[in-house]
Amino acid sequence: MGSMNAILQTFEFWQDRRMPYVETRRSCFGRTCYKSHSHPTFSIGAIDEGNSVFQSSFGTAQKITAGTLVIVPAHVEHSCNPMPNQAWSYQMLHLDLAWLNQLYSEFQEQGLDLHIPQDRK
């Protein structure tokens, strides 16, 4: 991870007016720490590089590493910060809760199976 120390921290946000129900954020080689907070959106985070400490109102702090996927329901207080003196990279997908609930309702109305598919070996 030494190579991450020499690279400047960057942040990118993405939104498209054609899809107002989705927003993404990407942080590369970040060291910024944030206080515990919540979002009005359903959020999915992917750790690309480095290590972090994830804490939420669901339980104790957990060390998470590259390759970890974190799911945070709307309005759940949480924090996710790099390990001390380390940088990390991650991506966040924020989905509007009203849009997600509408999508879920439409699936139910159409009788679509909303269960997670299982491997049928």
Question: How would you label these PLM feature ranges?
Answer:
Residues 114-121:
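Short, intrinsically disordered, charge-balanced linker/junction segments flanking boundaries
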Residues 11-114:
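N-terminal regulatory/effector-sensing and dimerization cores
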Residues 1-14:
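Short, extreme N-terminal leader segments that mark the start of a protein/domain
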